[in-house]
Amino acid sequence: LHISPSVNLKFSKDAYLIVEGSLTAIGGEANIITFKAMSDSWKGIYVLNANNKSHLKNVSISNITALEDGLLTLTGGVTFYKSDADFENVKISDIKAEDVINIVESNFSLKSVFINNTNSDAIDSDFSKGEVLDSEFLNIGGDALDFSGSDVSIKQIKASNVKDKAVSAGEKSTLNI
């Protein structure tokens, strides 16, 4: 799925975006791409089983609740499952899900990511490999960065008003900070 610069996507309360494949949303500095709710909230983004890498650049995402729909239940507001992803200059705010971004069994790069106002964890990486660079986490209800079985490099992050831990690592994770 390719989304053009300046596109402003508004989702209804029970709506969500599922992409079986890669997601490319590359905006410009002056013409960002926006994913937001029509009213209070929407159920987020789920990218799965992509053969090609997803790219999100100059993107704003807001007002997500957890995705629960019948048999489909996800902990992340934005979830990448077996789908490599690069995020650059992405702002995510006002998320009411267990994880803002949940990356599972994927390679990733998060550069200049700003996450604000969450009720739980900001980034949750499960059995993945990647990097978090030049990013900021503000008003986080759980951990800013939570790693399980992951191999991650972390450089120049700022975490403020984090309720639990700035960085949490378990299940044989390897971190380079």
Give the positions of each predicted feature:
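Beta-strand/loop edge motif enriched in small/polar residues
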Residues: 1-177
